Amino acid sequence: MRVLGIVVEYNPFHFGHLHHLEEAKKLINPDYVVAVMSGNFCQRGEPAIVNKFARTEIALKNGVDVVFELPVVYAIQDAGGFALGSVGVLDRTGVVTDIVFGSESGDVTFLRKVANLLTNQTPEFEKTFKRHLKMGYSYPNARKYALMDVLSNDVEKLSKSNDILGIEYIKALIKYSSDIQPHVIKRIGADYNDEQFKGKFSSASAVRKAIKENKFEQTKEALPEWTFKILEREFSEGRGPVFLEYFDFVIAMFRKLKREDFERIYSFNEGLDLRFYESARESGNLQDFVERVKAKRFTYSRIRRAIFHVLFDMEKSFVELSNEKGPQYLRVLGFTKRGRELLKAMKKNSKVPIISTASLYRNVLEEAKKKIAEGKVSWEIDESLYIWQFERDLLASDIYTFLYPNKFQRKAGMDFEYKVIEMLG
């Protein structure tokens, strides 16, 4: 049995995503497709345009069999943390055999070479990397320039977002000693960061920008039928669109904090705590705040992620433990009729417990502890980390719904109100 694993955000699902999914299926010819998807917040440090259940529905309508949620602790980290979580979820299903991801270079051999270099760092690389950090470069840029110095060739492959993420996926496969085989598909269409609307193969960034500018009807060109229909439903009922600009209220929260309060939160080092502390006292909105914090070593994405690290109380110790031990559960968001068959196989093969009903997450943990004690499974579950990871997912949902355009839709408890999306027709 071949099971294809893909890592997605679908913010929102567009024709470029559909192309990737169809090409991945042609490449692997899988029996099933499993997606691990960011929940209500995405890796660039932004809220998803619609909630995770709507995006799960879109994924299932377009050919995915099972959708798992990427815990928010990983979803709002840099490429390395994001990959540790997403590959961790796919590996811990116990059934995924292949992972396919987009790549600007289309050169999986080169990506493997870089991943191995970063995993087993040479003294030459470490020295060069530290030198670039001291020069004031951000972590990702310092690493890129160090790799360019060491490898000398193929430098353009180290600056593209999909290739960078692909390297991190392979590093994560190495860390987990995973049997999952990596494959790449050469990326087509607009660049990930291109906000110019270009018809059928516009980027997700361009689609979101068009929606923000009240040009939703125009996005029909770039969106499969079911994506447009479901977005239209969510928007009409006031459950979207949700944008980063809606989070101005965090400035007031930051003004309550002392500098040392920021220091205990993940990603606050290199003076970022002081810049947050001072900028909160000078800024009138979130956009102004981000611009004041911006510096050579702090990318916009890092600043935005740090905002949510504070908002979700992401303590350094628990995030670092999450990166060390990986996801402690598999949260099912939705499945098709075929996906239901695969979930049955997963229950026999998974390396961590599976959560289908959010309200029963503690019961699932107790049942897992019982199975471990009886020797029925060989899982290694960190009880406090399991609870911390899942309760951060719950908190992220509760904060997300507060930003819905329709105030009557803003109540907490999304994860308990929504059932797993079952598409059995």
From Swiss-Prot:
Gene3D superfamilies: HUPs. Pfam families: HIGH_NTase1 (PF05636). Its EC number is 6.3.4.-. ATP binds at residues 7-20, 102, 162, 187-188. One of its GO terms (biological process) is tRNA modification. GO terms for molecular function: ATP binding; ligase activity, forming carbon-nitrogen bonds; tRNA binding. InterPro entries: Rossmann-like_a/b/a_fold (IPR014729), tRNA(Met)_cyd_acetate_ligase (IPR008513). Its main location: cytoplasm. It is found in: Cytoplasm. The keyword Transport does not apply. Keywords: ATP-binding, Cytoplasm, Ligase, Nucleotide-binding, RNA-binding, tRNA processing, tRNA-binding. The keyword Transcription does not apply. One of its GO terms (cellular component) is cytoplasm. It catalyses: cytidine(34) in elongator tRNA(Met) + acetate + ATP = N(4)-acetylcytidine(34) in elongator tRNA(Met) + AMP + diphosphate. Belongs to the TmcAL family. Catalyzes the formation of N(4)-acetylcytidine (ac(4)C) at the wobble position of elongator tRNA(Met), using acetate and ATP as substrates. First activates an acetate ion to form acetyladenylate (Ac-AMP) and then transfers the acetyl group to tRNA to form ac(4)C34. NCBIfam families: PRK13670.1 (NF010191). This is tRNA(Met) cytidine acetate ligase. The gene is tmcAL.
